[in-house]
Amino acid sequence: MTDSWERGKGRRTQPPWSAPNTQAQPGLRLYNSLTRSKELFVPQDGNKVTWYCCGPTVYDASHMGHARSYISFDILRRVLRDYFKYDVFYCMNITDIDDKIIKRARQRHLFQQYRERNPRPSDLLQDVSAALTPFLQRISEANDPDKRQMLERIHGSVSAALLPLQDAVSSNARAEELERLSQELMEAAVDLLSDWLDEKHGAQITDNSIFSQLPKHWESEYHRDMEALNVLPPDVLTRVSEYVPEIVAFVQRIVDNGYGYVSNGSVYFSTAKFHASEKHYYAKLVPEAVGDQKALQEGEGDLSISADRLSEKQSPNDFALWKASKPGEPSWESPWGKGRPGWHIECSAMAGSILGESMDIHGGGFDLRFPHHDNELAQSEAYFDNDHWVRYFLHTGHLTIAGCKMSKSLKNFITIKDALQKNTARQLRLAFLMHAWKDTLDYSSNTMESAVQYEKFMNEFFLNVKDLLRAPTDVTGQFVKWEVPELELNSCFYSKKAAVHEALCDNIDTRTVMEEMRSLVSQCNSYIASRKAAKQPPNRLLLRSVSSYLTAMLKVFGAIEGEEVIGFPIGGSDNSMNLESTVMPYLQVLSQFREGVRQIARQHKVTEVLQLSDLLRDDVLPELGVRLEDHEGLPTVVKLVDRETLLKEKEEKRKAEEEKQRKKEEAARKKQQQEAAKLEKMKVSPSQMFQLETDKYSQFDESGFPTHDTEGKELSKGQSKKLRKLYEAQEKLHKEYLQMAQNGTTG
């Protein structure tokens, strides 16, 4: 044996390696509107991802419909960048030249001028009456029931303000009264007066600055809203007004390539010529919508669907690339005369200028698929002469309000600022994370309550882990032997991480991710409770790993800002970690001192000191954002929480106690009423109880027991048997009453 070992010394080599059995890792798949299915995501240029997102048309306040798209895309962008580690280059536009903007700017300008002229009450009445004629015509022609309802509501408000002013003018009321009623009518009639003034004088406006002031204001408000929602700013922001030369050149090349034609100073895209080309296909996203004139005209804009404009087209399916400006519209020089860009060409030219002939991702709301995005695709592929301007088209789902579409006519139009009055930006984001980004999201009290409870559930876990980690220990003391509970929790932890990764690969399924994270926290809570029940400390390192992972995931989703290692920031401050590390040692000393004082107060039964201790816990410290949790036989838990959250909890506790007291008093009142009713019933002698029911019985025996009904018929044996039971029960009650009266206990 020894000889064989000696002989083989020079020839020994390593044995073959046993390679592990590998399973293919899931790759990221995104739902691509171009195929209406989930496709493996493969960027065109290595790790770089080029992304264009349709931005807002800035003519009014941003609303929850905007939030649906921009929060959802912010989440997707962060996941690609911070989880999958792609190098994302994100471009977004601002539409500041548009029919809606032109019309709104003119109306606002003309109404402001009208208000400044301060028309006499009689002139105002005359003008409102004149404006009502076309307004009533609009109501009669309105096909959309929601729009019709809104117009009728405006008409009702105007009528309600019109009559008092008419009466005041007729009765020669005082000037102050006429002024007040005139202002009320002016406010009620702002919409129909603006329309009427625009129809009369809109064509006379020549100052282009009027059309830039409105979008500048609302763009600024939009950026404030996005910052408040913690939506990342784009890497590049393009404004239509800054890209007019590029748009003109873009249109010219489409014409040169044979897909555009000039008509009466405007330029239109020939959908027929484009679709006839072997290398092109019109309406890739929604081919079944081709020929939908309602959708096409909405895409052209309110100022571009007059009979003369529509007659300029070779086909009703064609759309404007460049619009010859009419009087009262802003204009720019072009080879075809003064005009302005069409809506669809704006995005094509700006995206092409920044991202080139092909991009990885284009994003927008679901309702933009046709005609806007289909027309964008056609224009850009006509310009670049390719068939792959966009590789992946992502569309966020609709947003409804408590099950209904959002509409001013339904009085459920909610701006982002309105929403932030009710919930925090984090709570709104959590609500979005708890729904699939491509599906309809219902913004309702139930939806938001679910998000609030999720936040509270996670926050309590983070606070409990922080408290455990603050328990004093030496360097080696933090490393303890793992028993079965730790091994099981760790196995669950890695299983949940794998499930989270799989869900993110599956079209960034944040809904499933949030549920897996909730389940992981539930497992941790059960583990902590079981260790405490066994008088054993939970494993600090394991819980720190779990909470750090959950915090990192919430950071990826944009639900946590700053450099927080574990949990949500305190008060939303980036300096929350410094705050916690600074004040917590002092709070721990205060907590220990308070606990010592309470023990002495209990021993000596000094209730005043115990009351002061409770006052410190319940009223004083919550005002400073500090929560103390007393546990019998265990050290007091100290938690730093947002002051607003603690005050809200305090208010909810107060309301709950008031409700409990109210129910207690209500129960006592009902009991008193029942006892009083019972006492009144006990007072009635059995010989009288049936004689009072003359609507049922007509004859009685000597004891007052009924023998015949109201028709004079003798009662059957069955009826008599039932009544005898009632008689005997009353006899017993009355006897009890007489005994109580004799004893003087009837109250």
Curated annotation (Swiss-Prot):
A motif ('HIGH' region) lies at residues 56-66. One of its GO terms (molecular function) is metal ion binding. Its main location: cytoplasm. Residues 15-25 have a biased composition (Polar residues). Its cofactor is Zn(2+). A motif ('KMSKS' region) lies at residues 405-409. The keyword Protein biosynthesis applies. Residues 651-683 have a biased composition (Basic and acidic residues). It catalyses: tRNA(Cys) + L-cysteine + ATP = L-cysteinyl-tRNA(Cys) + AMP + diphosphate. It is found in: Cytoplasm. Keywords: Aminoacyl-tRNA synthetase, ATP-binding, Cytoplasm, Ligase, Metal-binding, Nucleotide-binding, Protein biosynthesis, Zinc. It comes from the Eukaryota. A motif ('KIIK' region) lies at residues 100-103. L-cysteine binds at residues 55, 95, 372. It is an enzyme of class 6 (ligase). GO terms for biological process: cysteinyl-tRNA aminoacylation. Residues 1-25, 651-722 are annotated as: Disordered. ATP binds at residue 408. CDD domains: CysRS_core. Gene3D superfamilies: HUPs (3.40.50.620). Zn(2+) binds at residues 54, 347, 372, 376. Homodimer. This is Cysteine--tRNA ligase, cytoplasmic. The lineage of its organism: Eukaryota, Metazoa, Chordata, Craniata, Vertebrata.
